[in-house]
Regions:
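C-terminal output/effector regions of signal-responsive regulators
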Residues: 149-155
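Two-component/phosphorelay signaling modules centered on CheY-like receiver
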Residues: 25-46
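Non-catalytic signal-transmission and effector/linker regions of two-component phosphorelay proteins
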Residues: 1-17
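Conserved acidic segment of CheY-like receiver
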Residues: 16-27, 31-32, 66
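CheY-like receiver
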Residues: 55-147
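Switch/coupling loops of ABC transporter nucleotide-binding domains
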Residues: 16, 43, 91
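Conserved Asp/Asn-Gly motif in the active-site loop of CheY-like receiver
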Residues: 48-52
Length: 155
């Protein structure tokens, strides 16, 4: 993990782990580039080509945000999310899908997805949802930090 010296406020983290899951390499790479351009050194971006690979990656590393396609070979996004939730119930899952059928959105809600965006997705919509996920993480980290100390940084 890279060490970055930065002026970071209490409860704010330097790096967030983002997992992109899509069987379409061109879409995955384009999305990674756009996210990297927006967040820069605040994110580490990892990639998986299908749901099965995403589950395997989640079993070895915690991810802060998972951006996942619904329709993929080997294991679809909803099924992968069910397995991922058994491993990590706190990560934010954002689905990107070409399916506008309500049933897909309902299934996304069942696995506690943060959002369900339709492809082609406006990058500003995705970044807004990612910002919400990061704010949620920062609040959770601040609570953990204050719980571990007396609120003034003392243990």
């Amino acid at each position: 993990m890279a060490i970055i010296v930065n002026n970071v406020g209490a409860g704010e983290r330097l790096m967030y782990r983002v997992l992109l899951v899509d069987d379409e390499q061109i879409e995955r790479m384009a999305l990674a580039k756009k996210i990297d351009r927006y967040y820069g050194d605040k994110v580490n971006i990892y990639q998986a080509v299908n749901g099965r690979e995403a589950v395997a990656m989640c079993s070895t590393h915690n991810n802060d945000i998972i951006i996942m396609d619904i329709s993929m070979p080997e294991m679809n996004g909803v099924m992968a999310a069910k397995y991922i939730r058994r491993i990590d119930d706190k990560c934010s899952i954002i689905f990107l899908s070409a399916y506008d059928d309500f049933e897909y959105a309902r299934n996304a809600i069942k696995v506690k997805a943060l959002d369900y965006l339709l492809k082609p997705c406006d990058i500003n919509d995705l970044l807004a949802v990612m910002d919400m996920a990061i704010q949620k993480l920062d609040k959770e980290n601040a609570v953990k930090e204050n719980t571990a100390t007396d609120g003034k940084g003392n243990i």
